[in-house]
Amino acid sequence: MIDKKRLQNLQKKLSGRLLYDDLHKLLYATDASVYRKIPLAVVYPKNKKDLQVLIEFATQNKITLIPRAAGTSLAGQCVGDGIVVDVSKHFVNILAFDELKRTITIEPGVVRDELNLFLQPFGLFFGPNTSTSNRCMIGGMVGNNSSGSTSIKYGVTRDKVLQIDGLLSDGTDVSFKELTSEEFKIKTREQSLEGKIYKSIFNELSQDEVQEEIKSQFPKPSIHRRNTGYAVDELLDSDLFGGNHSTINVAKLLSGSEGTLVFSTAITLELDTLQPKESVIVASHFKSINESLKATVLAMNHELYACELMDKVILDCTKNNREQSKNRFFIQGDPEAILMFEVSADSLEEALDKAAALIKDLKYNNFGYHHPKITGNDIKRMFDLRKAGLGLLGNMIGDKKAVACIEDTAVDLNDLPNYIEEFTEIMDKYQQKAVYYAHAGAGELHLRPILNLKKSEDVSLFRKITTETAALVKKYGGSFSGEHGDGIVRAEFIPLMIGETNYQLLRRIKKAFDPNNVFNQGKITDAFAMDQNLRYEIDRNEPEIKTIQDFSDNEGILKLA
């Protein structure tokens, strides 16, 4: 047990603030997920020395450090009983920018949209674009290997990471970047922890049987959104392990590692030129989800910048939302699904021609009943509606909420219609009507069952639905996490998804990087149970709370939680 005196002594060694009052611990007990664990303390480190002090303290006291940026993670990555290390206050600087090379080095607390505001005058931007882009931070995006609505054109965060600087679990500085095979081998001969990490990776992945097991059990190579466990399959592309690439970059392994291997202090990103200035959205309306998914396979033969789905549940949520109801201007009738296809070009005329060709193709194949073309400022209104989807779902009236547990599955695009058909059968079995939305063009729909996690019977369903969906994803060779990460909700299913042999490989990699389990324990390996440490006390008799303001529209203030 770490007493108050030891925390007071720790504070004396730090430049940043260390807080361990009940209020701050409660504030940091949750993230955007369904989980809750009371941390030992919260710290706002000011510099690298603070982080080294924290690593030493955690090692000596056998506790964990939980990295946290904006806390927008949906799977519980920022939840733990150790010290929450919040980089959003002080690690917020742009460290270097090279316009000609199109690279930028930033600290992990830089907000994604603020980064792009800085880059806009130079005609550049960072492509991955999450629905939380106005508040999510690059450190979290790297930790989760985030994607967003533009991944079919600009890729995922891992594609853009060139270098990660940080601290290892012994407090030493490290830089992971692109190396030749010979440079990698030289690293394996070093006696430091860094050298031991390189040696461990080399020894593990050089074995033919290990490579074959990875290739046979990991998600299909055609699935670009793949965050199940550590990305060891990414390293096999190097000629060091018989692949076609002449270089290898361990920073790619760190992308999606959820802060469990290294504490990142600086990230170097590759940038893209801005999207062509003229865009047109084709908002195709469909009478069924299945029809929309078949249309997606066809539409992806066109050069699309985005292909996003909203289902009837999402659309109905916006009907009674004062802010979003005005953005429903393009909706005709009562569609079961709307697909938003984005095409772009240097001129509006060319973009309209691309849109017309897409509509012609859809109509020829009898897909959809209404295909309005959206241009100009109306595009932002439409995407505001899509971006609001997640927030509106979280504020459904009553205790039943659209729960994030199976919302991140990704399969091969050609498998998507059949996968969703079988998934719907699972939902029907449990008398569930799931929510379907987001990244159809990338083979990933955010599928959410609607559950009341304050009731034991729905907590039981929470596990059953997640378990059966995991098995279905495995059947199709998919990824159980496409962009939101494993966190708590999916980590215990990693052995099912990649096989026990590969899971033990991940445990050995974690051990090589972090032998004392300092960084974010309970995530990816040796995971917390997915149906424990939930936000709510199950089957509690809810008290009636009298309020001055009227919350009757939401069935009382507690139903807003």
List each model region and its residues:
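Short, conserved charged micro-motifs
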Residues: 3, 50-53, 114, 291-294, ...
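N-terminal glycine-rich flavin-associated loop
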Residues: 10, 33-65, 83, 87-132, ...
